[in-house]
Amino acid sequence: QKYTDKILNAAGLPPECIFLASSLKEAKTLEKIKTLAPDAGLSVMFDYILDKTFLDLFPGGIFNLHPGYLPYNKGAFANVWAIVDQMPAGVTFHVIDEGVDTGAIITQKKVKIEPIDTGETLYRKLEKSGIALFKEAWPSVESRKFSLHPQNPNSGTIHKKSDVEQIDCIDPDKTYKARDLINLLRARTFPSYKGAYFEENGKKIYLELKLYYGDAS
């Protein structure tokens, strides 16, 4: 809802044509969208799973810009898991099906992860690359002159939103490989969001990592 006014002004749409993501499964919302007779839909880094009832409202399909290099890092926090799991990072423009980021790929582009990247800096790079990829791909989608490349259902990785909770709590008495701990901390560094932490005297103490290049000598 943060950019509601900007979206309304840019699209030239009346407020009644804007729907909250949390309402997309409600019958009254689905009926309102149906009356608009949409052809195709566009999802951009959207955090909600769209079910078949919603997908069927768009005869031309719904296309998604995902901040991950599919089939790697399907689902949530693709920027985080690309660093933590050392998987390829990138952006993918694909067709939405009933799975989680499992639809056929139209085009994609890798984004290099630098040693000083954090969850935030990588996300910003993915945003920038995603915009460029969309501008490049949309004309072919609009004219229906694009190829589809099915994903291998047995390859890649997937994560739920809650998966980051399993890595955020750092145990000060646990033995970590230095590289793994550094990757975890930098992946979860995204001010002003809370990320990795440890607990002391009943309180959570949050950690952020600052990285920069220096002289090799």
Where are these regions (language model features)?
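One-carbon transfer enzymes
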Residues: 1-217
